[in-house]
A protein has these predicted regions:
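Bacterial N-terminal signal peptides
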Residues: 9-20
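N-terminal export leaders
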Residues: 3-7
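A structural boundary/capping signal
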Residues: 22-189
């Protein structure tokens, strides 16, 4: 179980279905790990990086897939009949097996959001894990409205970090490339 504490100096979530969101009040109980001000998300169409991901992802489906891309599709097919909680666990674990690499190592850029093909070939940083996990869960039938990208600050490592938060039957689960477990948000104290 995920026991490390992440203290968030800021939590900015965006629902990937372009809808506004609400996050728990910053004055919530001190042990609530998801403390933040109520925020509204901006339409993701204004985010050029996300737009590029969606355009490239649509294009990737029209070309001959690489061996790793075919393995991804085979992985999705292998878990499509699993219960949703098992799908979350397997998606988190499978992608966490890919190498973590910073954008400047791979692309020579400070911030690059990898398409599925790029991630599958090169690995990636935390946003890239979130993107591929999000797209995989969408392919498995998870509604966009039930998934959020959480941008957090980890005071222990001194870095910004991205997580995927998935609402499953009213419970928020965190998928994190730094931890192979998928846990309910209220267990991350």
């Amino acid at each position: 179980m995920l026991r490390r504490s992440l203290f968030f100096t800021g939590l900015y979530c965006a629902l990937l279905n372009l809808a506004p969101i609400g996050i728990s009040d910053a004055n919530a109980a001190a042990d609530d790990v998801l403390k933040a001000e109520n925020k509204q998300s901006a339409p993701l169409s204004i985010l050029p990086l996300w737009k590029r991901i969606l355009e490239d992802y649509a294009f990737e489906g029209s070309i001959e897939p690489s061996q790793k891309y075919r393995a991804w599709k085979k992985f999705i097919a292998s878990i499509e009949n699993d219960p949703p909680i098992r799908q979350l666990l397997k998606v988190n674990l499978w992608f966490n097996g890919f190498p973590y690499k910073q954008d400047n190592w791979i692309y020579g850029e400070e911030d690059h959001w990898a398409t599925p093909s790029e991630f599958l070939e090169n690995g990636g940083d935390c946003e890239d894990y979130v993107i591929i996990k999000y797209l995989t869960l969408r392919r498995l039938g998870f509604p966009a409205k039930d998934m959020k990208i959480a941008m957090v600050y980890d005071v222990f490592s001194g870095t910004d970090h991205a997580l995927l938060v998935v609402d499953l039957d009213g419970e928020n689960y965190i998928l994190d490339n730094r931890d192979n477990m998928t846990v309910a948000a209220h267990y991350t104290k």
